[in-house]
């Protein structure tokens, strides 16, 4: 089967400019691309035909051979020196076309820049620091731009060279069936540059390992898991790319008195059994000092007293939480003989379980369970 004239395939005149040829090919490629015409074999054939025509007409040497000898001039089997289909013309157009369609566009030759990696630092602080806010200094390991080569990776007085494998694109095309796929260049690692004479300070990396000290402001009300972002304090970028960010993650230390629950605080308050039975006034700790609360008579262990506004005002809260005090009635120890005697007397004056409502309730449940 004879091949159609390549100018006819693209719908351009024989004296068409390179831009006209490229424009015509872009239009046909987008119209007949197999991804846009799944299962349409006719469209696939037209796509291949347009691709072949552009491969020849976009290359000045191949176009000249085609204009002089026709298809025989570019057929590798004819022996007339056309060179076959290896060139970069199609690759560039393919990249431009599908960069337009899918938002990519890897056809330029700008040095590839990469943003530096983000860093994480776990910071332990006390409950009081979290409640009131504080400022502290941290020391972190990171990668900074090399001061000797200023990030180029090349020895001073020399310059990186363009990677010959990818032509400075940082990516290469690998043919897979009828399609070509872009991949990171294995030779330059995607930078598009090669360093033949590396910098002695960074050994060609363009970045060096260092420790730096930063001051971090901790806002009042932070809690475990909260993150503080320090923009641009992460690792340095590559080829002049922007630095990453540093995320300081807050972790609260255990407190000897309080436990935090959101904006509320909890604490246990031991009281004597005499105070629990007769009532009284006790002094309890808060983050702002001490406060006094009245304990009513017959207070049971586990009773909770709420002090409103004595908790923590969270970062995103409009008002502070509460302090919840859990009463813990203590059993006396190290009793003297006189104290033991008085307790025995008290027990003797307590007929049945009337003075112990919980015990009475428990015994009633036991009797009900056994049916007695």
From Swiss-Prot:
A zinc finger (CR-type) spans 133-211. CDD domains: DnaJ (cd06257), DnaJ_C (cd10747), DnaJ_zf (cd10719). CXXCXGXG motif repeats lie at residues 146-153, 163-170, 185-192, 199-206. One of its GO terms (biological process) is response to heat. Zn(2+) 2 binds at residues 163, 166, 185, 188. SMART domains: DnaJ (SM00271). InterPro entries: DnaJ, DnaJ_C, DnaJ_domain, DnaJ_domain_CS, HSP40/DnaJ_pept-bd, HSP_DnaJ_Cys-rich_dom, HSP_DnaJ_Cys-rich_dom_sf, J_dom_sf. Keywords: Chaperone, Cytoplasm, DNA replication, Metal-binding, Repeat, Stress response, Zinc, Zinc-finger. Residues 5-70 form the J domain. It comes from the Bacteria. Binds 2 Zn(2+) ions per monomer. The J domain is necessary and sufficient to stimulate DnaK ATPase activity. Zinc center 1 plays an important role in the autonomous, DnaK-independent chaperone activity of DnaJ. Zinc center 2 is essential for interaction with DnaK and for DnaJ activity. Belongs to the DnaJ family. This is Chaperone protein DnaJ. It comes from Thiobacillus denitrificans (strain ATCC 25259 / T1).
């Amino acid at each position: 089967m004879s091949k159609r004239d390549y100018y006819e395939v693209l719908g351009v005149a024989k004296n068409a400019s390179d831009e006209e040829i490229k424009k015509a090919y872009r239009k046909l490629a987008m119209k007949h691309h197999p991804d846009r015409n799944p299962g349409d074999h006719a469209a696939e054939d037209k796509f291949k035909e347009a691709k072949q025509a552009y491969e020849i007409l976009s290359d000045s040497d191949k176009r000249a051979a085609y204009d002089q000898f026709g298809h025989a001039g570019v057929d590798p089997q004819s022996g007339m020196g056309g060179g076959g289909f290896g060139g970069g013309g199609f690759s560039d157009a393919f990249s431009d076309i599908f960069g337009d369609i899918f938002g990519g566009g890897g056809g330029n030759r700008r040095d590839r820049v990469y943003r530096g990696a983000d860093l994480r630092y776990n910071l332990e602080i006390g409950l009081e620091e979290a409640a009131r806010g504080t400022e502290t200094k941290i020391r972190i390991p990171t990668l900074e731009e090399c001061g000797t080569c200023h990030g180029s990776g090349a020895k001073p007085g020399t310059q990186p060279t363009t990677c010959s494998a990818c032509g400075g694109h940082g990516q290469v095309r690998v043919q897979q069936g009828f399609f070509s796929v872009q991949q990171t260049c294995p030779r330059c690692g995607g930078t598009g540059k090669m360093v033949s004479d590396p910098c002695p300070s960074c050994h060609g990396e363009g970045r060096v390992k260092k420790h730096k000290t930063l001051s971090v402001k901790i806002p009042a009300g932070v809690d475990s898991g909260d993150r503080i972002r320090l923009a641009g304090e992460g690792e340095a970028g590559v080829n002049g790319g922007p630095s990453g960010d540093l995320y300081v993650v807050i972790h609260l230390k255990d407190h000897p008195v309080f436990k935090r629950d959101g904006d509320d605080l909890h604490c246990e308050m031991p009281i004597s059994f005499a105070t629990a039975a007769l009532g009284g006034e006790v002094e309890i700790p808060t983050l702002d000092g001490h406060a006094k609360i009245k304990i009513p008579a017959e207070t049971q262990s586990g009773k909770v007293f709420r002090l409103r506004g004595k908790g923590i005002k969270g970062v995103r809260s409009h008002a502070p939480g509460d302090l919840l005090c859990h009463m813990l009635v203590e059993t006396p120890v190290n009793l003297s003989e006189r104290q033991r005697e008085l307790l025995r007397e008290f027990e003797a004056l307590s007929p049945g379980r009337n003075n112990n409502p919980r015990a009475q309730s428990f015994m009633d449940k036991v009797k009900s369970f056994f049916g007695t």
